[in-house]
Amino acid sequence: MKFLHALISVCLATACAEEKHARSPENPLDHLSQNIEVLTHFGERADISPDNQRVAFMAKSFGDAMLIDLNSRVITCLTCNVPAAAFLRVMHLVTGDYILIGPNHFEDIDTSRTRDDELWFLSKQRGAKPIKLGQKISESAAISKKSLKIAFSQLSAQAPELAPGTSRLVVADLDLSAGTPNIVNKKTVYASKDRSCVLEAQDFYDNDRKLIFTCYEEQGPQKGASVMGIDITTGEVTNFSKAPGTYNEAEGIFPDGLYTTVEADRQCEQLGGERGYGNIDIWMLRLDGTGKDFTRLTGFNDYEGGKASNPVISTDGRFMTFQVGRTGDPPGVGFGILLYRFKK
């Protein structure tokens, strides 16, 4: 009888554990914590202005760049004067102007997002139109919050002189002094020889002396990603996440340079599900080089088909913006921008 009681107790405990860790069928937006609020019910890839008063974001992939005032909550369109705008990202410069990323025109999802992805300058002046910078890039760019320094990665699709499978990180400056914006002082600071590490620039830190980037590990059965950092002066590279076989994509960095946000699949250890860029949530990683200090910030992947992604930190470190998405959609696709206030 004691054995039976013990067995029943174990079974009940197991059932409770399974129930606790099962993903909920409900909507995560119906269960937001008090420090999270919805800014928009559409849009993706948000970026916070240097003065923390506005948030730029994309209405959709291959669409228009938008701007929301955090005080009035009024939303305006930055590129609606561009016919058939097909941009993928909008990012603030320290001057208050913008960098746009995207193709000249939409051809197809793969070609327009890879071969034709390029940088544009958009003045903050009302009615301004985007100006091509003549620079093809892969995915996103790192934009300094202190200067006009930028960084980006390239693959052979954007730089035909690169061998297939290789990639490189380039640091440069944006020159606005001559009237026509121009990219100068381009320097390759790191290169990868194969697809075991496909590079993407993310954020500057330590007064622009260092750069956070992601190493996408695309060889082998598991598609992982690691949070990396490079000292631009010495070339020293550090793997901050140290978790091979798992997905850890670097996102917005905190202003003190001690922590960065990460899109990670670490919760799959408890929740199950396929690992990789689909089942992700937002985590915070201490940049101490141990890879052990991870803190989960959002719980959207606790819900069936839910994920949170693309976090960006305000320059005062008091809040971040991020987007809600669906696990089955391509990376970067979002359905609303949210604001997350860090608890004091």
PLM feature spans:
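C-terminal motif of bacterial Sec signal peptides marking the signal peptidase cleavage site
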Residues: 14-15
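Positively charged n-region of N-terminal signal peptides that target proteins for export
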Residues: 1-4
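Sequence signature of WD/YWTD-type beta-propeller architectures
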Residues: 19-344
